UniProtKB/Swiss-Prot annotation:
Pfam families for this protein: RuvC
Gene3D superfamilies hit by this protein: Ribonuclease H-like superfamily/Ribonuclease H
The protein's role, per its UniProt record: The RuvA-RuvB-RuvC complex processes Holliday junction (HJ) DNA during genetic recombination and DNA repair. Endonuclease that resolves HJ intermediates. Cleaves cruciform DNA by making single-stranded nicks across the HJ at symmetrical positions within the homologous arms, yielding a 5'-phosphate and a 3'-hydroxyl group; requires a central core of homology in the junction. The consensus cleavage sequence is 5'-(A/T)TT(C/G)-3'. Cleavage occurs on the 3'-side of the TT dinucleotide at the point of strand exchange.
UniProt subcellular location: Cytoplasm
Native organism taxonomy: Bacteria, Pseudomonadati, Pseudomonadota, Betaproteobacteria, Burkholderiales
MF annotations from Gene Ontology: crossover junction DNA endonuclease activity; DNA binding; magnesium ion binding
PROSITE patterns for the chain: RUVC
Keywords: Cytoplasm, DNA damage, DNA recombination, DNA repair, DNA-binding, Endonuclease, Hydrolase, Magnesium, Metal-binding, Nuclease
Organism: Paraburkholderia phytofirmans (strain DSM 17436 / LMG 22146 / PsJN)
GO CC annotations on file: cytoplasm; Holliday junction resolvase complex
Residues at the active site: D7, E66, D138
Name the record gives this protein: Crossover junction endodeoxyribonuclease RuvC
Keyword flag Cell inner membrane: no
Similarity comment: Belongs to the RuvC family.
Length: 180
């Protein structure tokens, strides 16, 4: 199964594509969709078109996107919601099923700790997908979203305390940290 993960943002929308075969996860692609300093409708159009292009290029079977959280700044929350809506429209228009997860679910599923830092997320994504380099935070969050969906949104502790791909390497997660 091929999964497209999306970390929505008005200026930068992260994306990550992985393949899942049983407990094995494989990296396919990741990156960002950047919007120019333009009016809001143009930015939303760029996000929609970017997602549509990714779907044509990678043919995902399913997708996962982060739910909007209420920020201190209501204007930022509204703008994020609109960017998220543009991404979801691109997915739905292409017939790709959409799953939604909170940031807490994402961090628990990938790191095993709901208050994990961006750096911890990046490191776990590198280890889970056996990457040679560290992706940027937006791409790492999007890859994490795809991993979260592959795990069914469950935490590492629900999966027996150890992600199967980490167990093969003799690693486990304790208090949000990777230990050997």
């Amino acid at each position: 199964m091929r999964i497209l993960g999306i970390d929505p943002g008005l200026r930068v929308t992260g994306f990550g594509v992985i393949d899942q075969s049983g407990h094995t996860l494989s990296y396919v692609a990741s990156g960002v969709i950047k919007t120019a300093d333009a009016d809001l409708p143009s930015r939303l159009g760029t996000i929609f078109e970017g997602i549509s292009t990714l779907i044509r290029q990678h043919s995902p079977d399913q997708s996962a996107i982060e739910k909007v959280f209420v920020n201190v700044n209501p204007q930022s929350t509204l703008l994020l919601g609109q960017a998220r809506g543009a991404a979801i429209c691109g997915l739905v228009a292409s017939g790709v099923p959409v799953a939604e997860y909170t940031a807490l679910q994402l961090k628990q599923a990938v790191v095993g700790y709901g208050r994990a830092t961006k750096e911890q997320m990046q490191q776990m994504v590198v280890r889970l997908l056996n990457l040679s380099g560290v992706p940027g935070t937006d791409a790492a969050d999007a890859l994490g979203m795809a991993i979260c969906h592959a795990h069914g949104g469950t935490t590492l502790s629900t999966l027996g305390g150890i992600a199967p791909s980490l167990a093969k390497k003799g690693l486990r997660v304790r208090r949000g940290r990777l230990v050997g």
